[in-house]
A protein has these predicted regions:
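Gly/Gly-Pro- and Ser/Thr-rich, intrinsically disordered tail segments characteristic of DNA damage-repair
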Residues: 1-287, 291-294, 447-506
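DNA-contacting surface of Y-family translesion DNA polymerases
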Residues: 10, 231, 237-414, 434
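Short, charged/polar surface micro-motifs in flexible loops or helix N-caps
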Residues: 14-16, 40-44, 353-358, 424-428
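Acidic, metal-coordinating catalytic segment for phosphate/diphosphate chemistry
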Residues: 20, 374-506
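Generic "edge-of-domain/loop-turn" microfeature
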Residues: 41, 155, 189, 312, ...
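A glycine-rich phosphate-binding loop feature that marks nucleotide/adenosyl-phosphate handling sites
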Residues: 186-189, 284-286, 343-355, 413-425, ...
């Protein structure tokens, strides 16, 4: 292999959450009808995963539970029509049994999410990868997906990328019972596209493993005419819509546009006009190029960062009850800042309203369309900038509630809330910054002002000790070991959220 050529592998665990739940029940993940969803949240809840056997009936991986119910009802109506004597005599969630007996109705299991279990298994699988590749050459893209630079390992192991990918996948399969899909590419983009788009077309082997491979030449030959554009990594609906509005429907169209002459309509200037500096990445990907390497990912540090807490409420909340939840969320963000020893001087609140506000037709304010095309009131949004960086619960809660009181409409019911702490900085870095001067007016009493500053400093130190004590108790005995009176009020959500990971039960 030439010195500048590299080889990357992307591995995606097949229907990961569903596979974990099947294995925990001693069932075959490839042959069992199962969805991971929380039925206690009504049938509108989104399924976190759908097993491959159930997907075969035309159910998408991120369906809502009622869509699964309806599709299975349709499938069973068709099976009944074709069944002997037009009658179904039993039910089964096993795909092999359903294929062998036409008189059985399709059934499925609903497994409530268990995020702590999924994280535990994911860490176990990551440990398997480390048997083959060092952590410096692995990027964890998500809980069920990794990207690897295996360039330096192929000669060491005297193997090919395909054989190495297969060895790792089979090791995971034999250890956990979970199979996977892999993509191999000459850069990070191509290995991801090979996994996401090409591996789906490859027939599985006897273990259900699919592996696909792309280089720049094969990418252009196989995918330049592919539609829709949204199938490609990092091309969302907004990008695709803009491109299609200008007659660009494929990656081949984008590539050809990028080499158009200056006097032609289709040239790279059009792409930069549409997408700004982001056009550079789009053009690179259209040609199958990706300059970023694993070392770049490992060295990357964002210029700005933030911490946020968001939730979708179980039902529409009136103004006062939503304010209680905002207070809880602001306090949780402040405690997270303290735990991580970081501080902020800017807070943002976003309040999303429920569709019931427009259902009667009496709402006359500004509206937007939700993802389902329904009109809802435009969300409220505000930012508060503090005078200095802090992790004080008191100051953060006061600032966020101030935004809520100013921006939220008391007449509307609330469904979504997001609190974000921006412009974060580590506490130790604050010590290196010069102290901000205090400006006095002609009417200020310097001595009184000095006393006031000292009192505020003492108050902050007392609050800090209390917050540290609360964190210590929560770490030792659990997040619900210490609660405030507001957490016990009707409509409060902190107690339940403390039992979850990523919004789902542990």
């Amino acid at each position: 292999m030439p010195q500048n050529e590299r080889t990357y592998i992307a591995i995606d665990l097949k229907s990961y959450y569903a596979s974990v739940e099947c294995m925990e029940r001693g069932l075959d993940p490839m042959q069992t009808n199962l969805v991971v969803a929380d039925p206690s949240r009504t049938e509108k809840t989104i399924c976190l995963a759908v097993s491959p056997a159930l997907k075969a009936y035309g159910i998408p991986g991120r369906a809502r539970l009622f869509e699964v119910v309806e599709r299975v009802r349709q499938v069973n109506a068709e099976r009944q029509r074709r069944a002997p004597d037009g009658r179904l005599t039993g039910r089964s969630a096993d795909d092999l049994a359903l294929k062998a007996d036409a008189s059985l109705a399709v059934d499925y299991l609903v497994a409530p999410p268990r995020m702590a279990k999924y994280i535990e298994v994911s860490m176990q699988i990551y440990g398997i990868y480390l048997k083959y590749v060092s952590p410096e050459d692995i990027h964890t893209y998500s809980i069920d997906e990794v990207l690897m630079d295996v360039t330096g390992y192929l000669e060491t192991y005297r193997t090919t990328a395909r054989e190495l990918a297969r060895a790792m996948i089979l090791d995971v399969l034999h250890t956990t019972g979970i199979t996977a899909t892999a993509g191999i590419g000459s850069n990070l983009y191509l290995c991801k596209v090979a996994m996401d788009m090409m591996a789906k077309r490859v027939p599985p082997d006897e273990n259900g493993v699919r592996i696909a491979q792309l280089d720049e030449r094969s990418y252009r030959a196989l995918l330049w005419e592919h539609r829709p554009l949204t199938d490609f990594w990092r091309v969302g609906r907004g990008y695709a819509k803009k491109l299609e509005e200008h007659g660009l429907y494929t990656m081949g169209d984008v590539a050809r546009c990028s080499i158009g002459k200056p006097n032609e309509y289709y040239n790279e200037g059009l792409l930069y006009k549409l997408f700004g500096v982001n056009a550079e990445l789009l053009i690179d990907h259209a040609w199958g190029w990706e300059p970023c390497r694993m070392a770049d990912i490992k060295a990357y540090r964002p210029e700005t960062n933030s911490i946020s807490s968001g939730q979708v409420l179980q039902c529409p909340y009136p103004y006062d009850k939503a304010r209680l939840v905002v207070r809880e969320m602001a306090e949780a963000v402040a405690l997270e800042l303290l735990e991580k020893r970081i501080v902020t001087d800017q807070l943002t609140l976003t309040v999303g309203y429920d569709i019931e506000n427009t259902a009667s037709g009496s709402y006359r304010g500004e509206t937007v369309l939700d993802p389902y095309g329904r009109k809802i009131p435009k969300h409220a949004h505000g930012t508060s900038t503090l005078g200095q960086k802090t992790s004080s619960v008191r100051r953060i809660v006061d600032a966020v509630l101030g935004i809520y009181d100013e921006k939220a409409d008391p007449k509307l019911t609330v469904r979504r809330l997001t609190v974000t702490a921006n412009r974060l900085m580590r506490e130790e870095d604050i010590l290196c910054e010069p102290e901000q001067p205090v400006q006095f007016s002609l009417f200020d009493d310097p001595a009184a002002r000095e006393r006031q500053l000292r009192q505020e400093e003492a108050k902050q130190k007392r609050e800090r000790r209390i917050q540290e004590a609360m964190l210590g108790i929560k770490k030792k005995f659990g997040k619900n070991a210490i609660l405030k009176g507001m957490n016990l009020e009707e409509g409060a959500t902190a107690r339940e959220r403390n039992k979850t990971i990523g919004g789902h039960h542990e």
